[in-house]
Amino acid sequence: MKKLIIIAAALLAMTACSKSDFKQTQYIDDPDYPGLPIYSEMGYNTYGAYINEQVFTVSSHGSNRPFYLVADRECLTMTLYGWREGTNLNMVFTLPIDSTYHLEDYHDLLTLDGKRFDIDTTATSCNVKFEGYYPPTITSIYSGYISFEKIQQVIVDKEDAEIIVSGKFQFRAFGPDGNRLDVVGGRFDLGVDQTNFINFRR
């Protein structure tokens, strides 16, 4: 069943906003994970993780959504634009999505609610890579996962606003020289609509 959120008293400040305001990032530091945004399920358009104890986080605060999702006939690709040590670094997840998910538009992301995908290098699991300025190279993935903890629909003033996609991830990978790459504490809280969901399945 599709989940529906009616923004009411608890989100009074958000009800006064226009739809365009949902595209802004709302960054709140996590006191338990210094440098990362809190884990949230409010569509704050933030994400982050530690990469070998270095902070990877959303590329800009307060700007338009710095991420996008692309669906085709075989997979769903989620690209998170970010920073690590002052340089551009993008984290790209590729999830195997078969026809049972019917990802025709962003509302269909609700079918992923509560789903968890293992991360490794097999065709039936989620894969991940880095892009950007001198990104780490991954040659193998030892173990990991990405979980969609909560996916929910937001209605504001009786109109569809967005789908909130929130979840967690972590994985251990290895580079070409055998060096280990540990990604831990990963979290994302994304507001998705027709502006950042692209469908190539048609």
Show which residues each predicted segment covers.
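Sec-dependent bacterial lipoprotein signal peptides
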Residues: 1-18
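Extracellular low-complexity Ser/Thr/Asn/Gly-rich intrinsically disordered segments
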Residues: 2, 17, 41, 75, ...
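Acidic/polar, low-complexity intrinsically disordered N-terminal segments immediately downstream
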Residues: 20-77, 202
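A mature extracytoplasmic/lumenal domain signature
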Residues: 53-55, 60-62, 84, 95-97, ...
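Short acidic/polar mixed-charge low-complexity motifs
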Residues: 54, 87-89, 179-180
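Short capping micro-motif at the N-terminus of alpha-helices
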Residues: 58-59, 119, 183
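Surface-exposed helix/loop patches within compact recognition domains
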Residues: 64-159
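C-terminal or internal capping secondary-structure element at the end of a domain, subdomain, or sheet
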Residues: 144-202
